[in-house]
Amino acid sequence: MNFNAHFELRDKHAFLSPSSPYWTEYDDQKLIDSYKNYQAREKGTRLHAFAAEAISLGEKLQGHSRTLSMYVNDSIQNKMQPEQTLYYSEKCYGHADAIQFRRNTLSIYDLKTGLVVPGKMRQLEVYAALFCLEYCIDPHDINIELRIYQFDQAVCYEPDPDDIEELMQDKIVRFDKILKMVDEEE
């Protein structure tokens, strides 16, 4: 039999995918709610790509959502680097929405486009810990500014360097060693 190729669908997954059949247990309302969340995530992915391109080009925004415009315009004004990968190991890395390290200050901005759940600073603290590990910087020797852009506002936070160091050593480094031991056992 000659099966249909569907080249355009390679490396993609349908919402009603056989590989994640949880949806077969949904009622109609749960299906609709789940699909709306999926659509919001897809839109968020596209908005992040759009914002990264605008920042890279230095194109300030007007006429878009207040949250998106604030995030892009602040990132441009503060010379942030969009979509930067922060790497500790194959088991622990992430992609910061916007980051800058100048004048001994680490700034990390995060754009949240979701509808319901407020963003958490813990994610940005992990990015700060990854930055310090990757570039061999003691968090006590720098200033750290974290910002979440969501719900038409920017929430700013300066984490305690001890919290960042604890994340670095007690979580990232220790957990990475544990996972390496698990890999070696197999």
Per-region residue spans from a language model:
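Metal-dependent nuclease catalytic cores that hydrolyze phosphodiester bonds in DNA/RNA
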Residues: M1-H95, F101
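Mg2+/Mn2+-dependent nuclease catalytic core
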Residues: Q84-K177
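Accessory terminal regions of nucleic-acid processing enzymes
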Residues: D176-E186
